[in-house]
Swiss-Prot record:
Gene name for this UniProt entry: rplM
Family: Belongs to the universal ribosomal protein uL13 family.
Subunit (UniProt): Part of the 50S ribosomal subunit.
GO molecular function terms listed in the Swiss-Prot or TrEMBL record: mRNA binding; structural constituent of ribosome
Protein name: Large ribosomal subunit protein uL13
Length: 147
């Protein structure tokens, strides 16, 4: 008997919606990354995109633990002299919460061509509304310890 390998056309894709209100950013990112990669499915294969679509709503109400809002920093450099920009996670959440969540999920994914394709299935919205009602997304609950 040969080992089963999923084919690209056989993959059944589901849509999940995650409410990020009062959810810790790291826990949300790991859950979303696992759903995007398809690791929750028995047909998972690391070389084939078996993942689902993930819609994250209320990204502006996400939680950070400890002093991460001020002490966790992100460094960007333009490549020119004096081109270093330092941004805290709190500033990033205030300015663009969508980008902060996308960046956290990106950090949980492998760095290859397949993950770039899988990240295109992540949709993040700052408020409670999203335009994907036609896809009938299923709510996905993240269980967490009280903060």
């Amino acid at each position: 008997m040969t080992t089963y390998s999923p084919k690209v056309g056989e993959v059944q894709r589901n849509w999940y919606v995650i409410d990020a209100e009062d959810i810790v950013l790291g826990r949300l990112a790991t859950t979303a990354a696992n759903l995007l990669r398809g690791k929750h499915k028995p047909q998972y294969a690391p070389h084939i995109d078996t993942g689902d679509f993930v819609v994250v709503v209320n990204a502006s109400k996400i939680a950070l633990t400890g002093k991460k809002a001020t002490d966790s920093l992100r460094y960007d450099h333009s490549g020119r002299p004096g081109g270093l920009r330092v941004t805290s996670i709190g500033e990033m959440l205030a300015k663009n919460p969508r980008r902060a969540v996308e960046r956290a999920v990106w950090g949980m994914m492998p760095k290859n061509k397949l993950s770039r394709q899988q990240l295109k299935k992540l949709k993040v919205y700052g408020g409670p509304e999203h335009p994907h009602a036609a896809q009938n997304p299923q709510p996905y609950e993240i269980t967490q310890i009280a903060q």
